[in-house]
Amino acid sequence: MLCSIYKSPKKEGTYLYIPKRDDFSQVPDTLKQMFGKPIFVMLVNLEQRQLAQVNVEKVKQSMQEQGFFLQLPPPPENLLEQHKERKARQTP
């Protein structure tokens, strides 16, 4: 299964996967507005490649059911909170 991947100029780390290049007909208008003008990144064969941030099966399922897949950036790490949790576990 081939898919085209686009990145958002508005939201860093946000990517849109669609089955056909430049065919955004299945993407809701509200998502298109929030995403901004898509910037083409690459064409990928999902049968022959793993993806770095997302599960290939989830991408394929979403594209079959909804006509697209939206990849959001991972949540930012809260280093202060992690430090506090480690400290709390260390105290007897």
Swiss-Prot record:
Domain of life: Bacteria
Region span, Disordered: 71-92
Domain YcgL: from-to ranges: 1-84
Pfam families assigned to the protein according to its UniProt record, in alphabetical order: YcgL (PF05166)
PANTHER family in UniProt: PROTEIN YCGL
HAMAP family linked to this entry: UPF0745
Protein name stated in the entry: YcgL domain-containing protein VC0395_A1544/VC395_2072
Organism, as annotated: Vibrio cholerae serotype O1 (strain ATCC 39541 / Classical Ogawa 395 / O395)
